Amino acid sequence: MKNLVLSFLIIFSINCFSQDTITTAKVNEYMDKEVCVIGKVVSMKLASEGKSTNYINIDKPYPESVFTVVISNRYLETLNLKLEDLMGKIIYTKGKITIYKNDPKQIPQIFNPISIVVKKE
């Protein structure tokens, strides 16, 4: 059973890395495509009471953000991770690159990513 779980994790990791794994500097080139973005979590805004959206800024903090991971509280439960534990870590985020239509800064984002994996040190 342990080998089966280990095999699954390896296959999942290979799947993320075998796709286009890009840095935040290249996200604009992959608009509306599903990719795996690598970068360091430098700041975040967690949903306050009455709010339901969390923002994780990768490589540069807000307001100089170059890429943001946006996760709703409901969806966060399916990812099974604590956002606070990601601060300062390098992560792989898999999902579709989009831009929120009402964002005046037009910052690329992944909304409710398929997966977030912390890079092993």
List where the protein language model places each region.
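Bacterial Sec-dependent N-terminal signal peptides
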Residues: 1-20
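OB-fold single-stranded nucleic acid-binding module
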Residues: 19-121
